[in-house]
Amino acid sequence: NVYIEYDCGANRCGLESFKEIQSLIDLINTMSNIKFKGFQAYNGSIQHIEDFVQRKINVQETCNKIRSLKTRFKDYSPIITGVGTGCFDLEVKENVYDEIQVGSYAFMDAHYSSLKKDSKVNNTINFKNALFVLSNVMSTSVKKQAVVDAGLKSMSLDSGLPTVFNYDLKYINCSDEHGVIEDLDNLLKINDKVFLIPGHCDPTCNLHDWYVVKKDNIVIDLWPVSARGFSY
Protein backbone atom coordinates (compact mmCIF):
# COMPACT_ATOMS: atom_id res chain seq x y z
CA ASN A 1 0.00 0.00 0.00
CA VAL A 2 1.31 3.45 -0.90
CA TYR A 3 0.14 6.93 0.00
CA ILE A 4 0.52 10.05 -2.11
CA GLU A 5 1.68 13.11 -0.22
CA TYR A 6 -0.72 16.01 -0.73
CA ASP A 7 0.58 19.54 -0.24
CA CYS A 8 -2.23 20.87 1.94
CA GLY A 9 -0.51 24.11 2.89
CA ALA A 10 3.02 23.52 4.15
CA ASN A 11 4.57 24.15 0.71
CA ARG A 12 7.18 21.59 1.58
CA CYS A 13 6.62 18.33 -0.29
CA GLY A 14 3.89 16.55 -2.19
CA LEU A 15 1.51 17.30 -5.03
CA GLU A 16 -1.21 19.94 -5.06
CA SER A 17 -2.49 19.71 -8.64
CA PHE A 18 -5.37 17.25 -8.96
CA LYS A 19 -4.26 16.56 -12.53
CA GLU A 20 -0.80 15.53 -11.37
CA ILE A 21 -2.29 13.46 -8.57
CA GLN A 22 -4.52 11.61 -11.03
CA SER A 23 -1.53 10.91 -13.26
CA LEU A 24 0.38 9.46 -10.33
CA ILE A 25 -2.58 7.29 -9.29
CA ASP A 26 -2.84 6.02 -12.85
CA LEU A 27 0.86 5.17 -12.83
CA ILE A 28 0.56 3.35 -9.51
CA ASN A 29 -2.36 1.35 -10.86
CA THR A 30 -0.19 0.01 -13.69
CA MET A 31 2.07 -1.68 -11.15
CA SER A 32 1.23 -5.08 -9.75
CA ASN A 33 3.35 -4.87 -6.60
CA ILE A 34 1.92 -1.68 -5.08
CA LYS A 35 -1.58 -0.36 -4.45
CA PHE A 36 -2.78 3.23 -4.04
CA LYS A 37 -4.28 3.50 -0.56
CA GLY A 38 -4.76 7.19 0.21
CA PHE A 39 -3.15 10.52 0.98
CA GLN A 40 -0.60 11.80 3.45
CA ALA A 41 -2.02 15.26 4.29
CA TYR A 42 -0.03 16.67 7.18
CA ASN A 43 0.43 20.42 7.53
CA GLY A 44 3.36 20.82 9.89
CA SER A 45 3.58 24.56 9.30
CA ILE A 46 0.45 25.27 11.38
CA GLN A 47 1.23 23.15 14.43
CA HIS A 48 3.16 25.83 16.34
CA ILE A 49 0.98 28.89 15.64
CA GLU A 50 0.62 30.46 19.08
CA ASP A 51 -2.53 32.52 18.52
CA PHE A 52 -5.60 30.31 18.82
CA VAL A 53 -7.78 32.27 16.38
CA GLN A 54 -5.11 32.24 13.68
CA ARG A 55 -4.39 28.57 14.31
CA LYS A 56 -8.08 27.76 13.87
CA ILE A 57 -8.26 29.75 10.62
CA ASN A 58 -5.26 27.88 9.23
CA VAL A 59 -6.72 24.52 10.25
CA GLN A 60 -9.98 25.32 8.47
CA GLU A 61 -8.12 26.38 5.32
CA THR A 62 -6.07 23.18 5.39
CA CYS A 63 -9.06 20.94 5.97
CA ASN A 64 -11.11 22.64 3.26
CA LYS A 65 -8.36 21.75 0.79
CA ILE A 66 -8.38 18.17 2.01
CA ARG A 67 -12.17 18.05 1.79
CA SER A 68 -11.96 19.06 -1.88
CA LEU A 69 -9.31 16.38 -2.40
CA LYS A 70 -11.54 13.69 -0.89
CA THR A 71 -14.46 14.77 -3.05
CA ARG A 72 -12.37 14.72 -6.24
CA PHE A 73 -10.95 11.25 -5.59
CA LYS A 74 -13.88 9.70 -3.71
CA ASP A 75 -14.12 6.81 -6.19
CA TYR A 76 -10.87 5.46 -4.76
CA SER A 77 -12.13 5.60 -1.15
CA PRO A 78 -8.80 7.07 -0.05
CA ILE A 79 -7.59 6.94 3.54
CA ILE A 80 -6.53 10.40 4.70
CA THR A 81 -3.72 10.47 7.26
CA GLY A 82 -2.45 13.57 9.02
CA VAL A 83 -3.00 15.78 12.10
CA GLY A 84 -0.36 17.06 14.53
CA THR A 85 -0.02 17.65 18.25
CA GLY A 86 -0.42 21.43 18.05
CA CYS A 87 -3.74 21.39 16.18
CA PHE A 88 -5.19 17.94 16.82
CA ASP A 89 -8.12 19.27 18.86
CA LEU A 90 -9.18 21.46 15.92
CA GLU A 91 -8.26 19.11 13.08
CA VAL A 92 -10.23 16.11 14.30
CA LYS A 93 -13.40 18.23 14.51
CA GLU A 94 -13.21 18.88 10.77
CA ASN A 95 -14.01 15.21 10.05
CA VAL A 96 -11.69 14.87 7.07
CA TYR A 97 -9.09 12.53 8.56
CA ASP A 98 -9.24 8.76 8.86
CA GLU A 99 -5.96 8.38 10.73
CA ILE A 100 -4.32 10.61 13.34
CA GLN A 101 -0.50 10.59 13.28
CA VAL A 102 0.34 12.86 16.21
CA GLY A 103 3.65 12.12 17.91
CA SER A 104 5.08 14.97 19.98
CA TYR A 105 2.30 14.65 22.58
CA ALA A 106 4.20 11.71 24.08
CA PHE A 107 7.08 14.01 25.09
CA MET A 108 5.71 17.54 24.69
CA ASP A 109 8.05 20.53 24.83
CA ALA A 110 8.12 24.11 26.05
CA HIS A 111 6.62 25.58 22.91
CA TYR A 112 3.76 23.11 22.56
CA SER A 113 2.96 23.63 26.23
CA SER A 114 2.64 27.37 25.65
CA LEU A 115 -0.07 27.10 22.99
CA LYS A 116 -3.44 28.49 24.04
CA LYS A 117 -6.17 25.89 23.89
CA ASP A 118 -8.95 28.34 23.07
CA SER A 119 -9.59 32.05 22.75
CA LYS A 120 -11.33 32.46 26.12
CA VAL A 121 -8.93 31.02 28.65
CA ASN A 122 -5.16 30.93 28.76
CA ASN A 123 -4.64 27.21 29.17
CA THR A 124 -2.76 24.69 27.09
CA ILE A 125 -3.31 21.35 25.41
CA ASN A 126 -3.60 18.81 28.19
CA PHE A 127 -0.49 16.68 27.86
CA LYS A 128 2.22 16.63 30.51
CA ASN A 129 5.88 17.15 29.78
CA ALA A 130 7.78 13.86 29.78
CA LEU A 131 11.05 14.89 28.14
CA PHE A 132 13.71 16.72 30.13
CA VAL A 133 17.36 17.58 29.71
CA LEU A 134 19.26 17.14 32.98
CA SER A 135 21.75 19.93 33.62
CA ASN A 136 24.10 20.78 36.45
CA VAL A 137 24.86 24.17 37.94
CA MET A 138 28.52 24.86 37.19
CA SER A 139 28.83 28.52 38.17
CA THR A 140 27.14 31.08 40.39
CA SER A 141 29.91 33.64 40.19
CA VAL A 142 27.54 36.35 38.95
CA LYS A 143 24.88 37.36 41.43
CA LYS A 144 21.25 36.64 40.58
CA GLN A 145 22.13 34.11 37.90
CA ALA A 146 23.33 30.53 37.61
CA VAL A 147 25.16 28.91 34.73
CA VAL A 148 24.31 25.32 33.80
CA ASP A 149 26.11 22.91 31.48
CA ALA A 150 23.33 22.66 28.89
CA GLY A 151 23.36 24.95 25.87
CA LEU A 152 23.13 24.69 22.09
CA LYS A 153 24.82 21.29 22.01
CA SER A 154 22.21 19.86 24.37
CA MET A 155 18.95 21.37 23.10
CA SER A 156 17.43 22.68 19.90
CA LEU A 157 16.41 26.34 20.15
CA ASP A 158 14.53 26.70 16.85
CA SER A 159 11.24 26.94 18.78
CA GLY A 160 12.60 29.06 21.60
CA LEU A 161 14.53 28.70 24.83
CA PRO A 162 13.87 25.86 27.27
CA THR A 163 11.92 26.37 30.45
CA VAL A 164 13.04 25.39 33.94
CA PHE A 165 11.12 22.51 35.52
CA ASN A 166 10.05 22.65 39.18
CA TYR A 167 11.62 26.05 39.79
CA ASP A 168 10.10 29.49 39.32
CA LEU A 169 13.18 30.48 37.35
CA LYS A 170 13.85 31.52 33.78
CA TYR A 171 16.45 30.25 31.31
CA ILE A 172 17.49 33.49 29.61
CA ASN A 173 20.52 32.88 27.42
CA CYS A 174 22.87 30.22 26.13
CA SER A 175 26.02 29.47 24.19
CA ASP A 176 27.42 26.20 22.85
CA GLU A 177 27.89 24.46 26.20
CA HIS A 178 26.44 26.86 28.76
CA GLY A 179 23.00 28.08 29.73
CA VAL A 180 22.20 31.09 31.87
CA ILE A 181 19.33 30.94 34.37
CA GLU A 182 17.99 34.09 35.97
CA ASP A 183 18.06 33.41 39.71
CA LEU A 184 17.06 36.60 41.50
CA ASP A 185 16.99 34.99 44.95
CA ASN A 186 20.18 32.96 44.43
CA LEU A 187 18.37 29.67 45.01
CA LEU A 188 20.71 27.50 42.97
CA LYS A 189 24.04 26.23 44.25
CA ILE A 190 27.03 24.61 42.56
CA ASN A 191 26.24 21.03 41.40
CA ASP A 192 22.48 21.45 41.83
CA LYS A 193 20.54 19.38 39.30
CA VAL A 194 18.18 21.37 37.08
CA PHE A 195 15.72 19.71 34.72
CA LEU A 196 15.06 21.71 31.55
CA ILE A 197 12.08 21.36 29.23
CA PRO A 198 13.43 21.84 25.69
CA GLY A 199 11.74 24.28 23.33
CA HIS A 200 11.43 21.65 20.57
CA CYS A 201 11.43 17.96 21.45
CA ASP A 202 12.17 16.34 18.06
CA PRO A 203 15.56 17.87 17.18
CA THR A 204 16.59 17.81 20.85
CA CYS A 205 16.25 14.02 20.95
CA ASN A 206 18.53 13.80 17.94
CA LEU A 207 21.36 15.36 19.97
CA HIS A 208 21.49 12.53 22.53
CA ASP A 209 22.38 8.84 22.58
CA TRP A 210 20.08 7.62 25.35
CA TYR A 211 16.81 8.26 27.10
CA VAL A 212 17.15 7.72 30.84
CA VAL A 213 13.73 6.37 31.80
CA LYS A 214 12.36 7.22 35.24
CA LYS A 215 9.27 6.05 37.10
CA ASP A 216 8.38 7.31 40.58
CA ASN A 217 11.72 9.11 40.58
CA ILE A 218 13.64 5.86 40.07
CA VAL A 219 15.66 5.07 36.94
CA ILE A 220 14.17 1.91 35.48
CA ASP A 221 15.71 1.67 32.02
CA LEU A 222 17.90 3.14 29.30
CA TRP A 223 16.49 3.44 25.79
CA PRO A 224 18.83 4.11 22.85
CA VAL A 225 17.94 7.00 20.54
CA SER A 226 17.90 4.83 17.42
CA ALA A 227 17.71 7.77 15.00
CA ARG A 228 20.67 9.56 16.62
CA GLY A 229 22.46 11.69 14.03
CA PHE A 230 20.13 10.73 11.18
CA SER A 231 18.90 13.49 8.89
CA TYR A 232 16.17 11.42 7.25
Give residue ranges: language-model regions.
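Active-site loop/helix belt of alpha/beta enzymes
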Residues: 7-121
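A general structural signal for short secondary-structure boundary/capping elements
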Residues: 49, 85, 124, 130, ...
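Active-site loop ensemble at the mouth of alpha/beta enzyme cores that anchors a bound cofactor
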Residues: 87-167
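A short catalytic or substrate-binding loop motif that flags glycine-/basic-rich loops and adjacent residues
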Residues: 82, 128-131, 173
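Glycine-rich, flexible loop/turn motifs
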Residues: 11, 137, 219
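C-terminal accessory subdomain/extension
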Residues: 140-232
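Catalytic-face loop-and-helix region of soluble metabolic enzyme cores
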Residues: 4
